[in-house]
């Protein structure tokens, strides 16, 4: 009889687990705008990964993972979100170089020069640091800084390291536009004139051709006019929602993962990453961006803040990297309120391209994409705060 009672109790508890609604879907039902997106989830190519975080008695994080329409084989353009692993591997390579005897840190001064002719003299022999380049990427997603970092690590280094760490859906095939210097191969040297960049003779590795939906749209804007035919993304950069969030988890909680599935980073590197990821645009050296009208304090945060240009509560920190291009908008973030202890991971992408034309810069970002990402994160945050 006792065994029967235990069996019935187990079945009841198991049924309760199955009956619990996916919190992602539940959060979208609480808002009319989100509900409308939910009804058209396939049109908007939504993919969402959400991880609840609780703490055990020792304060260690306990993850509970949820997904909505996540499919690693369905392509979406990662845009600037792929800059996060570029930065991670920049720090990784700095440590590799230091192990060979080169005296270098993220704060070290470096010489960045162009391999082109005198017409680009303005870019020759400029002195900066990896810290400044990385800060500019996190604060305003600077493309030139990102492309310099790509030439520092090299495509092969990036793609090989991603596979070694278990991220098999993340590939780097090209640099970022718009950038007036996108075709320049940058040479990076130490102040001792040691060449440390890896930009020459790089072989790019294209995304697995088994990937689905590599062609998007019905038309494309080309040479000043709309021409028929889908845009082919087969040679573009590639990532997945799962890879993005798992990379971020290793940055926020590196001790929760096996060393062979993390990166060659030290404690200072992780602190450095977390600091700059969580900055609002005008914080620290970001004060220099106040003179440019297109920027605002929450410019680099789709989640929680959206188009609200004023940061209203700095107790809520968003450790993230956003991306937006070709109709795709993405945010990949660890969100934490240091006052009430609410914390979670959220990674989401949405595709908005009503006229089905690629490259015409008419993508409903402000009308649909950014409001979706901000409202989704706010709804999930509210549920956790109850």
Located regions from the model:
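Active-site-adjacent helix/loop patches that line small-molecule binding or acyl-intermediate pockets
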Residues: 21-33, 124-253, 257
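A short, well-structured edge-of-sheet supersecondary motif
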Residues: 29-70, 346-348
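Active-site SXXK
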Residues: 76-105, 346
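Residue-level preference for non-acidic, small/hydrophobic
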Residues: 83-90, 137, 162, 244, ...
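Short, glycine/proline-biased beta-turn/loop segments that scaffold the active-site neighborhood
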Residues: 96-127
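Active-site-proximal beta-strand/loop segments in catalytic clefts of secreted hydrolases
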Residues: 51-53, 138-141, 152, 174-175, ...
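Structured C-terminal helix/loop/strand segments within mature extracytoplasmic catalytic/sensor domains
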Residues: 19-35, 226-386
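Bacterial Sec-dependent N-terminal signal peptides
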Residues: 1-24
């Amino acid at each position: 009889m006792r065994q029967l009672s235990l069996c019935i109790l187990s079945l009841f508890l198991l049924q309760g687990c199955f009956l619990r609604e996916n919190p992602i879907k539940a959060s979208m039902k609480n808002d009319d705008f989100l509900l409308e997106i939910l009804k058209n989830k396939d049109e908007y190519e939504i993919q969402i990964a959400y991880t609840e975080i609780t703490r055990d008695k020792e304060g260690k994080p306990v993850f509970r993972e949820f997904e909505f329409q996540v499919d690693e084989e369905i392509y979406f353009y990662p845009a600037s979100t792929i800059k996060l692993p570029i930065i991670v591997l920049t720090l990784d390579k700095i440590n590799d170089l230091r192990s060979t005897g080169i005296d270098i840190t993220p704060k070290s001064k470096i010489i960045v020069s162009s391999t082109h002719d005198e017409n680009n003299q303005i870019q020759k022999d400029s002195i900066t640091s990896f810290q400044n380049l990385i800060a500019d990427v996190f604060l305003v997603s600077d493309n030139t800084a990102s492309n310099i970092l790509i030439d520092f690590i090299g495509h092969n280094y990036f793609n090989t390291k991603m596979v070694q760490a278990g991220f098999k859906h993340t590939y780097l095939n090209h640099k970022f536009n718009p950038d007036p210097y996108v075709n320049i191969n940058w040479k990076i040297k130490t102040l001792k004139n040691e060449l440390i960049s890896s930009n020459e003779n790089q072989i790019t590795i294209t995304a697995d051709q088994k990937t689905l939906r590599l062609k998007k749209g019905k038309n494309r804007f080309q040479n000043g006019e709309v021409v028929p035919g889908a845009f082919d993304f087969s040679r573009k950069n590639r990532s997945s929602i799962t890879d993005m969030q798992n990379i971020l988890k290793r940055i926020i909680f590196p001790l929760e993962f096996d060393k062979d599935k993390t990166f060659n980073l030290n404690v200072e590197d992780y602190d450095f990453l977390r600091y700059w990821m969580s900055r609002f645009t005008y914080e620290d050296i970001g004060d220099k961006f106040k003179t440019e009208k297109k920027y605002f304090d929450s410019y680099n945060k789709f989640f929680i803040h959206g188009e609200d240009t004023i940061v209203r509560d700095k107790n809520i920190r968003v450790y993230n990297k956003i991306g937006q291009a070709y109709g795709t908008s993405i945010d990949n973030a660890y969100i934490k309120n240091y006052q009430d202890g609410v914390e979670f991971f959220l990674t989401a992408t949405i595709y908005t391209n009503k006229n089905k034309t690629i490259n015409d810069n008419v993508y409903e970002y402000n009308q649909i994409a950014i409001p979706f990402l901000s409202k989704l994160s706010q709804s999930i945050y509210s549920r956790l705060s109850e």
